[in-house]
Amino acid sequence: MASEKEIRRERFLNVFPKLVEELNASLLAYGMPKEACDWYAHSLNYNTPGGKLNRGLSVVDTYAILSNKTVEQLGQEEYEKVAILGWCIELLQAYFLVADDMMDKSITRRGQPCWYKVPEVGEIAINDAFMLEAAIYKLLKSHFRNEKYYIDITELFHEVTFQTELGQLMDLITAPEDKVDLSKFSLKKHSFIVTFKTAYYSFYLPVALAMYVAGITDEKDLKQARDVLIPLGEYFQIQDDYLDCFGTPEQIGKIGTDIQDNKCSWVINKALELASAEQRKTLDENYGKKDSVAEAKCKKIFNDLKIEQLYHEYEESIAKDLKAKISQVDESRGFKADVLTAFLNKVYKRSK
């Protein structure tokens, strides 16, 4: 018997083939040959639906809460409308990941070769990334151009895309994999990187899109959402950094590589804030080296500095702050605190 979660995921996935068909129809309308249409369909299917789909599903879940319905109570037309916006976020994610994997020279993504590593693809993946982004605006135009919020959601996608790219830029110039310089790291910089690179598109964007469709568009309400979701997104990334270093491969489903990859993670930044001169020297000499002995030296310092305990203290403190903020939410214009509680519950004390 499929769980409620699996049934919801299945319903969401069922919308995607129609979107691929629609995007391909626009290529045919331009008179593109079959091989170009097939290539685009392959790229869309390879890069978009393979992940956890959390961002896309969040649009649907949030809209349902704002509409006082369960997801199952949404009629098909109403459901598809918000699901398309969910898929637009998944296309944005696909666009970022195809490009990121090339910049990071990654080998696999979601258990299969990265797109640029697929035979025949190579550097064509750069253009494919652009085309994944372009798909967002084709879909917004064909499904939403007659809605009063069309310009708002289009501008929101542009704005959040630019914010994410700024976060990526900061990350790339702060922590290049081949040039370790811990003097460039700081908790303030880490906060900027994760807010821009992750929080806006993964946490704020899904909720803001659902709010526009539900007719909750007052700037005060968008701000209420932002004021919880941006710090929540930062907490989510700090948790990710913590799990990469302290989680087991069985628990997180991968081997943590942040230390060897010279990542500007919360763990190293917290350690740099607290390290003695001697510990700092050891970190300078060993962080970012593709070497398990060097990695173990860094981990020993993290343990000596009790980073794990400090993370748990941080987690309790941020969760308490966010719960307090959520309890103050003004629901008089139709926004609902439950939207934010649902997000916090997904993140708090997760272990993978």
From Swiss-Prot:
The protein's Enzyme Commission number: 2.5.1.10, 2.5.1.1
Cofactor note: Binds 2 Mg(2+) ions per subunit.
Keywords tagged on the record: Isoprene biosynthesis, Lipid biosynthesis, Lipid metabolism, Magnesium, Metal-binding, Transferase
GO cellular component: cytoplasm; endoplasmic reticulum; vacuole
Binding site for isopentenyl diphosphate: K52, R55, Q93, R110
Family matches, as CDD domains: Trans_IPPS_HT
Reaction catalyzed: isopentenyl diphosphate + dimethylallyl diphosphate = (2E)-geranyl diphosphate + diphosphate; isopentenyl diphosphate + (2E)-geranyl diphosphate = (2E,6E)-farnesyl diphosphate + diphosphate
Annotated Mg(2+) 2 binding sites: D100, D104
Residues engaged in binding Mg(2+) 1: D100, D104
Enzyme class: transferase
Role played: Farnesyl pyrophosphate synthase; part of the second module of ergosterol biosynthesis pathway that includes the middle steps of the pathway. ERG20 catalyzes the sequential condensation of isopentenyl pyrophosphate with dimethylallyl pyrophosphate, and then with the resultant geranylpyrophosphate to the ultimate product farnesyl pyrophosphate. The second module is carried out in the vacuole and involves the formation of farnesyl diphosphate, which is also an important intermediate in the biosynthesis of ubiquinone, dolichol, heme and prenylated proteins.
Record-stated family: Belongs to the FPP/GGPP synthase family.
Record-given protein name: Farnesyl pyrophosphate synthase
Organism per entry: Saccharomyces cerevisiae (strain ATCC 204508 / S288c)
